[in-house]
């Protein structure tokens, strides 16, 4: 790569939001919903120059006339045509760059299928003509962003949660655990418990309102049962929220009942272990000699770890599971909503990383499988 002065692009494609920007920046320039919308009825608005598809915020604002699709489900790309539209939108509309002029760092979910990494690589080189690219595991980037190379990352976004033990910069694939319980499920659960109180939230538009209620008012209780009793005996925990139409609703124990599902998935009718137990199970799958380093470096990452109280609760629950002498430390960086992107920004701007890029020449020589040799 001769372009020393060319800024690399960093794109973190999440199930719910896409975060994109320039390597070396401390925050993403563009954050928009990972959605593609297509008109439900064609040609109603004659002469309006109606597009055949909309991406991100524009799709969100026109959702009344569109069918919305999320091309990334549970962290894994399932619809490549729509994914290509999202990348196109990222380059040309959000960042306003020519992809053929910049190296591109993409992120992937832990345990992403091999065929998927190849497809990402192929699209970048063949559709967008990028000069160079790289694919990095999301949780590893979050760990880098926290200034560590060893630790266990509990990454929870909109579509999926993972616990990823990392030793000296390498994820340990045999010990990675996936939990299909994340932000979207918590929003759905909040809709359900608010409906039980007599408020009706059903449409996709109303779901966005509930997501906002969740993000602004929900928190994790340190002791769930005690908190339930406090909520029942006083109004100290009640908060009011004004809906877009001016109606004011009051929310009480829903504030902490909603995120409690992270620790007790049975609330959602799921039989899986909670995030604390999943973290513990991940650690127990690792070599006994590195467990101490993992317990002492539990890094929270992703938007669904933004609830107040989550770190203290995680500490309490892990302490109960771990050997009694073990020192446990939960790291919850304030910017953890974007720590995957930030880690990518750091990585792509390191001088030592510059030889790691897959160049167009290497791709033309070896084809998409080059990604398994160079990105691990």
From Swiss-Prot:
Name this protein carries in UniProt: Actin-10
Pfam families (alphabetical): Actin
Function in brief: Actins are highly conserved proteins that are involved in various types of cell motility and are ubiquitously expressed in all eukaryotic cells. Multiple isoforms are involved in various cellular functions such as cytoskeleton structure, cell mobility, chromosome movement and muscle contraction.
Single Gene Ontology BP annotation: phagocytosis
Homology family: Belongs to the actin family.
Upper taxonomic lineage: Eukaryota, Amoebozoa, Evosea, Eumycetozoa, Dictyostelia
Keywords: ATP-binding, Cytoplasm, Cytoskeleton, Hydrolase, Nucleotide-binding
Compartments where located: Cytoplasm, Cytoskeleton
UniProt-listed PANTHER family: ACTIN
EC number(s) per entry: 3.6.4.-
Enzyme's top EC category: hydrolase
Biological source species: Dictyostelium discoideum
GO molecular function, one term: hydrolase activity
Example of a GO cellular component annotation carried by this entry: cortical actin cytoskeleton
Reaction equations catalysed: ATP + H2O = ADP + phosphate + H(+)
């Amino acid at each position: 790569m001769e372009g020393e002065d060319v800024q690399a692009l960093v794109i973190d494609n999440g199930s719910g939001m896409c975060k994109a920007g320039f390597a070396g920046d401390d925050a993403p320039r563009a954050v928009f919903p990972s959605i593609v919308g297509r008109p439900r009825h064609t040609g109603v608005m004659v002469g309006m120059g109606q597009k055949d598809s909309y991406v991100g915020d524009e799709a969100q604002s026109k959702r009344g006339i569109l069918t919305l699709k999320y091309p990334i489900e549970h962290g894994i790309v399932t619809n490549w045509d729509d994914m290509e539209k999202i990348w196109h939108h990222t380059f040309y509309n959000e960042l306003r760059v020519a992809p053929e002029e910049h190296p591109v760092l993409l992120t992937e979910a832990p345990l992403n299928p091999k065929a998927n990494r190849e497809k990402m690589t192929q699209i970048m080189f063949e559709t967008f003509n990028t000069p160079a690219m790289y694919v990095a595991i999301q949780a590893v980037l979050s760990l880098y962003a926290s200034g560590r190379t060893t630790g266990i990352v509990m990454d929870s976004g909109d579509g999926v949660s993972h616990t990823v033990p990392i030793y000296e910069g390498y994820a340990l694939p045999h010990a990675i655990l996936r939990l299909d319980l994340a932000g979207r499920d918590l929003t759905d659960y909040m809709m359900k418990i608010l409906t039980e109180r007599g408020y009706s939230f059903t449409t996709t538009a109303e779901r966005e309102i509930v997501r906002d209620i969740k993000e602004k008012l929900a928190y994790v209780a340190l002791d769930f049962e005690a908190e339930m009793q406090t909520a029942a005996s006083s109004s100290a925990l009640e908060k009011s929220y004004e809906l877009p139409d001016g109606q004011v609703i009051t929310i009480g124990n829903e504030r902490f009942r909603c995120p409690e599902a992270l620790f007790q998935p049975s609330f959602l009718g799921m039989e899986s272990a909670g995030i604390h137990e999943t973290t513990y199970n991940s650690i127990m799958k690792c070599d006994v000699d590195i467990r101490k380093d993992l317990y002492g470096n539990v890094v929270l990452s992703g938007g669904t770890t933004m609830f107040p109280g989550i770190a203290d609760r995680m500490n309490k629950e892990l302490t109960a599971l771990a050997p009694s002498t073990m020192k446990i430390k939960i790291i919850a960086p304030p910017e953890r909503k974007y720590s995957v992107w930030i880690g990518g920004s750091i990585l792509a701007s390191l001088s030592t990383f510059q030889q790691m890029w897959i160049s167009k020449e290497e791709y033309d020589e070896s084809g998409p499988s080059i990604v398994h040799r160079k990105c691990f």
